[in-house]
Amino acid sequence: MSRNHKKAIIAFLIVFAVALCYLRVVPETALSERAIVVGLGIDKTEKGYAVSCEIINPKSQSGGGQGESDGFALISGTGKTLDAAIGEISQKTGLKVSLSQCNLIVLGNMFLTEQTFPSVNYLVQTYAVPELAIIAVAENSAAELLKTKPVMTTLSALQMQQTLHSATDDASIISTNVKDFFKGYLSR
């Protein structure tokens, strides 16, 4: 191989590496194509899971939601797995579900079993749920809790977050986040 061929190959590899790093080979999803979840409710059913999402930006929703106004809605989906239930919500909205802004996870009372940790771990690793997201447990159904009409804000998830943040000094109300949940679970 001649010296010019080696230089050409090296130059090509450098250009290729720069193109890979800086030209964004991975397609980017526009914000208008995302269903931004601010509150997530998970219930265990006989057939699998029921997931309720309080979503901002459900514009291309084709049905199945409740309370849609001012760019937000509560949309539910069911499936044998969490992924299937979230996929149903994505199909109903026509948008890609994004949990990276979800700061509240409500677990239904029937959900508190040994599967709690793997399910929360799956959400954090697959959908990038923030580690400071609050985890709350509903007395009955997580969907019922998210359906409640808040007094101070338009989104019940935001009202619950504010209430739980302000109640952390009260010893009768236990509030935890994803990070503390993992720390407590893994330290057993």
What label would you give each PLM region?
Residues 1-188:
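Membrane-proximal alpha-helical signals and transmembrane carboxylates
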